[in-house]
Amino acid sequence: MNKQQAELLNGIALAYIGDAIYEVFVREYLLDKGLTKPAMLQKNATKFVSAKAQAKIISAMDEVDFLTEYELTYFKRGRNAHSKTTAKNTDVVTYRISTGFEAVVGILHLTQQKERLQEFWDFSLKTIEADLV
């Protein structure tokens, strides 16, 4: 997929791939930290991938103007997208913010912005790492 095609995707599609990419980042990080027991992996992964965690990261990013205008465009596209799925363990607003978060990861991945995606991950890690067991 080229950049132009990626930029035309709807917010849900971007969040779909962004969710998968972010999940891989988290899983690799946890394994690298030496966590191997399934219960601990799941418990700690949830601290990164839950809608509440992703909303917390976006809030922290907003406080320091971390997101570029380009990224904000795709965050809003994801946040404002109408999804058929419903929030499981959170309110609708938090769920939509997390969809926006995942959409940013998706657009960065699909447009091959690897350095910026790493910066995004590093910021996310710093924001959530203090909550790890």
Curated annotation (Swiss-Prot):
It comes from the Bacteria. GO terms for molecular function: ribonuclease III activity; rRNA binding. Its main location: cytoplasm. Gene3D superfamilies: Ribonuclease III domain. Its EC number is 3.1.26.-. InterPro entries: Mini3_fam, RNase_III_dom, RNase_III_sf. It is found in: Cytoplasm. Keywords: Cytoplasm, Endonuclease, Hydrolase, Magnesium, Nuclease, Ribosome biogenesis, RNA-binding, rRNA processing, rRNA-binding. Its cofactor is Mg(2+). GO terms for biological process: rRNA processing. The keyword RNA-binding applies. Belongs to the MrnC RNase family. HAMAP family: RNase_Mini_III. Homodimer. Involved in correct processing of both the 5' and 3' ends of 23S rRNA precursor. Processes 30S rRNA precursor transcript even in absence of ribonuclease 3 (Rnc); Rnc processes 30S rRNA into smaller rRNA precursors. This is Mini-ribonuclease 3.
